[in-house]
Amino acid sequence: MIFDRVPKKYTVESGGQIQACGTSGFLHEVIRPSTPSKEVSITLPDTILCEIRLFSKGQLPDTVQDWEAPYNDCDMLLLPTHADDEHIFFGGIMPYYAGEKGMKVQVAYLTNHWGEPYRPHELLNGLWEVGIRAYPVISEFSDYYSEALEHAKTLYDTEKMLAYEVELIRRFKPEVVVDHDINGEYGHGVHMLNTWLLQQAVEQSGNAQYFPESAQKYGTFDVQKTYLHLYPENELIMDVDTPLKAFGGKTAYEVAVAGFSKHVSQQKWFSVEKSGKYDCRKFGLYRTTVGLDSGIGDFFENVTFSDAPDPLPPKEESTQETASDIQTESSDTVSKTESTLSFWYLIPIVLGGAVLLCCII
């Protein structure tokens, strides 16, 4: 199911069993009814449902976004400022490390695009295309344009933003963090702000005196390696031209371009480049606790992994009592829709406490 906004809690009833859903905060969500049935009733209070697709038992197509929860402990944390930055400036990192090598790459955005409802969908579509499977973190900070760092600082509560970045590091415990060019890529003040904040966050995340609330919740953590796009010192040039088996022989660059193509609204302004001023291959090691790179082009060179393999998050489950509590909050209005298996249909309506009944024939 694809929602217009992150849904409130809702229920799915199948074979007399009621599941509580909508607790993950996913905009695109796969629900597996607890009991096989030819009739499924979905109760959606005050929610806009854009698309729903039904499948028979078996493996889902690769194009279906069956998101996992954000990692408990990731290998790499990417910190793009806006939706699409992760492809334009970080290029082949996600296709290679997440898609090809199967490493735990967590993406967390400094700003959100809830004021442009189509962009969060583009964000998810792009990430899925390049091999990201852990749901991204999207901050509460709105997107504003700025042409200078000092101006950008006036647009936000920078202490609150710094707390956010410190908490991300402590929560996800990445061995490697990647962020923007210090000069804001093309001069965007909020890109500059993002990196200015990270430069402080990597120094503070290991000290419990800074932001003690997140230190108490997640513990402290010191990142081993911090890379910045286009940073001129300790340069790393990423190989984005080697064919990747996970993507049928496409290169990391080609996959990055395909990921950015999902950001339909941004195509006339930007592109993914592997040369020139905004070369997506070029990074520099800004901070390290494990020594300098040798030049082999691997972000994880010299890194020591201390975490155990991350278990797959459990599929959404809840007790029938909790589900019933949610269902009680909604009205008895019923909208019945019939569909054959694997059939797409669009529901551009606000379901204010409505019940969607899917009859499978």
Regions found by a protein language model. Name each.
Residues 351-361:
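C-terminal membrane-anchoring or membrane-association module
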Residues 96-100, 147, 241, 246, ...:
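Residue-level signature of transmembrane alpha-helix interfaces in integral membrane proteins
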Residues 95, 139, 214, 238-240, ...:
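Generic alpha-helix signal with a bias toward terminal, lower-confidence helices
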Residues 3-9, 16-211:
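Active-site beta-strand->loop->alpha-helix modules in alpha/beta enzyme cores, enriched
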Residues 5-16, 22-33, 67-68, 204-332, ...:
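The feature marks non-catalytic terminal segments
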Residues 335-343:
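Short, Lys/Arg-rich cytosolic juxtamembrane segment immediately N-terminal
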